[in-house]
Amino acid sequence: MAEHIRNCAGGVVFAGDDVFLLKNDKSEWIMPKGVIRDRRSAREVALYRVEAEAGIEAEIVALAGRTSYDFYSQSRRKSVSNRIQWFAMRASDHRYRIAFEHGFLDGDYFPYEVAVRLLTHEQDREILRRARAILTGEAPQGE
């Protein structure tokens, strides 16, 4: 069991049928996300992280689901559990600006099938599938 729990929020951003992904400093393909702080809501944090990490102004359509993972924090010297709420989002265009200053190595919009293959973690692939199903009307929306 993790000694420290971090509640996080992130965005699964679609522009048309394309999905925005970032490559982090470990060369993992991920979606924008961050820790919920300062009494902000999960929705606020998800929108903020999408804008801060990718320069994308998106709107939330629905909650896509939740994931969690544990890791050992070298700096904290204890195990940490990240619990993430993911939101299906739509951007009006394909414009973006990668926040290289936050350690990201790359990022872009990719066709859905390519994005599914690129994502490093299976949990992220499942959330992407769920978000797409919500956005195409193939799954019920639920928050």
Model segments located where?
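C-terminal alpha-helix
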Residues: 130-137
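Hydrophobic pocket-lining residues within nucleotide cofactor-binding pockets
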Residues: 36, 91, 112
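The catalytic Nudix box helix
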Residues: 31-66
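NUDIX/MutT-family hydrolases
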Residues: 86-88, 97-129
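Short aromatic/basic micro-patch
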Residues: 30, 81, 109
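N-terminal strand-loop-strand
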Residues: 1-32
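Active-site segment of metal-dependent pyrophosphate-handling enzymes
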Residues: 55-95
